[in-house]
């Protein structure tokens, strides 16, 4: 009897093992769909983490809310067109972007490159060498013209003060006089009224060095945001103003200094308490997966994964902003090669990057009805001077216009 029982147990274990072996691919796919992890051990750990979702309050995302400004197509991409000296290369960039199915570009209109040498000075004499200066607007007029020709809309990033406007140190320090910043954003909005419709004020002000060599300051930033909002709306009441995306961080050290910053949830709540809710039409967020894929459903406020925008949405709902959408400013995975030491943005293969980015857009469209445009980070850099830096490897296309697998994957996905 004992032998028979032992035999039955062994048969049962063997059948279970065989079943698990035969179903291993389906099991691993199911675990990836929950954890965003591809390694089996990481999937098991991730499943345990996911179980903690059941014992903590889930974000209230108000998925049934009517959203005011969806943006049409969700496909946006970050560009650095101002870095391209040759006009033909700007045109080729936008041709390839439109050809891949993107409908929006997120493009800087940096203050230091427009009102360069002093208040009211829109001439660029930096490379004149004794000859005539050029119109500082010409570059940006060309970018707007080309975007229109290729059927692309622009999210214009308004940021980066010139030295003459700053008293605090640091390239990204805010202006000493908010009226100067207001004049700049009003000048951009007036020049492109009816052609540019969406303006984003600043970028990641909760993180060093995006507020200069001084502690980050949610209340100070809110004053700048509200000043810009008023001036843009005075010029173009129909324009839409985007709040900046905040750096996803758990840091509680406002800085200044490398590695410092203020947690994005705390910074945003303090912005709301300072009155920021009246000073933007669209919220922004970063959606980096970093060390796991786009299907990661673990809700972990003390770590960064693709699900983090759910917490930004929850804060918006708590503060009465359920009708406003979130537009994702930056989204991608880092295909940094082994020889680059910096892996702070995670590391995936070129093939995995090409698989993850379309999956991210799929999740955005299927699960997050309050997301409008989601902008891929990024199309290309003008040169390979930064190829020793991890950030360079988010690109879709090399500086010589060689497309990477992720470009082809997005082109195929948007065509579906």
Predicted regions and their residues:
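Hydrophobic faces of well-ordered beta-strands that scaffold small-molecule active sites
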Residues: 73-79, 105-107, 154-158, 199-201, ...
